[in-house]
């Protein structure tokens, strides 16, 4: 079985409209994980499409100008069903988090401001879960777009 602790094997995509949050995330986790960042949902979707086979975990803020985080998570689920999806919410956005959990669009939600040690564990467990799923069925790693080739 492949090493589940090779956390750089698959990338983490973090989407947030706050530049400071993107910078803090990259600084906190860049040594342990391969990181992509995007400043809005549309940019995040573009990165997902361009790097679909590289990204194992998507973490997105809910409240952003334009499309919301749940919108991106739903598209990610269609593009790459096995991708681990994490929603970042403020306490005021708990209804969105509950709806996302209930619809099956997310693996977990994280509240803002996030706690680095706790978030590190969430990212590690999420990537481990992704790697187990992929190792059991490599064809599941690819989303519906791969079947159109």
Regions found by a protein language model. Give the residues of each.
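C-terminal output helix
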Residues: 95, 114-123, 127
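Active-site T/S-Asp motif of two-component receiver
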Residues: 59-61
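Amphipathic alpha1 helix at the N-terminus of the CheY-like receiver
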Residues: 20-30, 47
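Non-catalytic signal-transmission and effector/linker regions of two-component phosphorelay proteins
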Residues: 1-13, 23-26, 54, 124, ...
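Alpha4 helix (beta4-alpha4-beta5 surface) of REC/receiver domains from two-component response regulators
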Residues: 71, 92-109
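The feature encodes the CheY-like receiver
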Residues: 65, 89
């Amino acid at each position: 079985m492949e090493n589940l602790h090779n956390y750089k094997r698959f990338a983490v995509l973090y989407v947030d409209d706050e530049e400071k949050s993107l910078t803090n995330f990259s600084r906190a986790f860049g040594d342990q994980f391969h990181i992509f960042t995007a400043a809005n949902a549309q940019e995040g979707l573009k990165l997902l499409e361009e790097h679909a086979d590289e990204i194992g975990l998507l973490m997105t803020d809910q409240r952003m100008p334009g499309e919301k985080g749940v919108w991106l998570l739903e598209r990610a689920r269609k593009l790459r069903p096995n991708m681990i999806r994490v929603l970042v919410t403020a306490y005021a956005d708990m209804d969105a988090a509950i709806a996302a959990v209930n619809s099956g669009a997310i693996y977990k939600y994280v509240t803002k401001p996030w706690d680095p040690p706790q978030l590190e564990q969430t990212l590690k467990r999420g990537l481990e879960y992704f790697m187990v799923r992929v190792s059991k069925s490599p064809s599941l790693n690819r989303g519906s777009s791969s079947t159109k080739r």
